Amino acid sequence: MTIAHVAWVVPCFDEATRLDRAAFLALTEGCAPASVIFVDDGSRDGTLALLNDLAQARPGQIEVVALAKNQGKAEAVRQGMLRALAGPAGIIGYLDADLATPPAELQRLVELARSSDLDVLLGSRVQLLGRAIQRSSARHYVGRVFATCASLSLGLPVYDTQCGAKLFRRTQALAAALAEPFTSRWAFDVELLGRLAHPPSGVDPIAVARMHEEPLRIWSDVPGSKLHPLAAVRGGLDLLRLALKTRLGR
């Protein structure tokens, strides 16, 4: 049986001091056959040089997409996923450059995606006994409010839309969802799920039965996050707009 090639998209903006070279090199081996597509989002430090060095260390496995100017995480992810769709990947995912979800967990998600018929697989930060989810109380509670609003706006029982570890099977719905830039910079994860569940006419939607949230065993906040407190407010406004768009029809 052919093992599906997985492509991980990693958006990067000024990550030169946080990027774990060894961990990403190991990720390409642990998820093999796999590739990593780094998208440099107009970084102002040495990020692009570091990424190019990584690509030289793993030719054919690590690729760099360099955006001329900063366009935001949403567009960086979209551009990376479009590049992945142009390649051999049967499964395409994205993750945060800080590896808050560690490589071992990412490999576990890949194995689950490969061994199932799921079209959407989301890592979910659920604090349970026996799990090591290290997240500040403030972020946890703000995140719960946001996630509840996201679930209501989508009309889907999703627990955690913002965890930076997601996998998608190559489908017509995924290609359609990525065809146009996201309208939201702050809630693009939610917008992507909405596009998959409510695609344009003529495209089969992704059924809820083929979406799955997998509780992570390990996840930890990494110092140096660029998320501004106002992002939660902007994200909330974006959710309201997305909810109205869904209710009024696409």
Indicate where each model-derived feature is located.
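A conserved acidic beta->alpha catalytic loop
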Residues: D40-A49, L99
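Short, well-formed alpha-helical segments that are part of the catalytic scaffolds
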Residues: D14-E29
